[in-house]
């Protein structure tokens, strides 16, 4: 898959692979932000696992899918959200309250909006998954 934004391509590719029933997907090229988002997806139970593979170029991630993703995507442009403003973005990107996850980049790293709300910190909404 070619495009200008590897992050968006990674999420769209995983979404497409899940929708046709594939059990794995290769994300190329690898980046720190993609790795951090995959860690959040793993922690929230959306993927079975992932592994970084050094191919001598930019690297890649082998992602084990488990069929738990109905839809995922990048949020463009990146919206800033305070710790008390996540509900507005939940209404916009998620189908129901407490169903799905917004992925947020904060000064404490990449995390789900549930963790950010719990810690009382805001950040930029970069992706959603449900």
UniProtKB/Swiss-Prot annotation:
GO MF entry, a single one: rRNA binding
GO biological process, alphabetically ordered: translation
Keywords: Ribonucleoprotein, Ribosomal protein, RNA-binding, rRNA-binding
GO cellular component: ribonucleoprotein complex; ribosome
InterPro entries in alphabetical order: Ribosomal_uS8 (IPR000630), Ribosomal_uS8_CS (IPR047863), Ribosomal_uS8_sf (IPR035987)
SUPFAM superfamilies per the UniProt record, alphabetical: Ribosomal protein S8
Ribosomal protein as UniProt keyword: yes
Quaternary state and interactors: Part of the 30S ribosomal subunit.
HAMAP family in the cross-refs: Ribosomal_uS8_A (MF_01302_A)
Family, similarity comment: Belongs to the universal ribosomal protein uS8 family.
Summary of the function given for this chain in its UniProt record: One of the primary rRNA binding proteins, it binds directly to 16S rRNA central domain where it helps coordinate assembly of the platform of the 30S subunit.
Full protein name: Small ribosomal subunit protein uS8
Organism: Halorubrum lacusprofundi (strain ATCC 49239 / DSM 5036 / JCM 8891 / ACAM 34)
């Amino acid at each position: 898959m070619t495009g200008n934004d590897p992050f968006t391509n990674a999420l769209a590719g995983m979404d497409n692979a899940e929708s046709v029933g594939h059990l794995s997907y290769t994300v190329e090229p690898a980046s720190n932000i993609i790795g951090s988002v995959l860690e959040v997806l793993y922690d929230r139970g959306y993927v079975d696992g992932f592994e970084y593979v050094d191919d001598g170029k930019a690297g890649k991630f082998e992602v084990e899918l488990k069929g738990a993703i109905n839809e995922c995507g990048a949020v463009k442009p990146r919206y800033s959200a305070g710790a008390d403003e996540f509900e507005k973005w939940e209404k916009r990107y998620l189908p129901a309250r407490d169903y799905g996850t917004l992925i947020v980049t904060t000064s404490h790293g990449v995390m789900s909006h549930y963790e950010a709300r719990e810690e009382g910190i805001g950040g930029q909404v970069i992706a959603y998954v449900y």
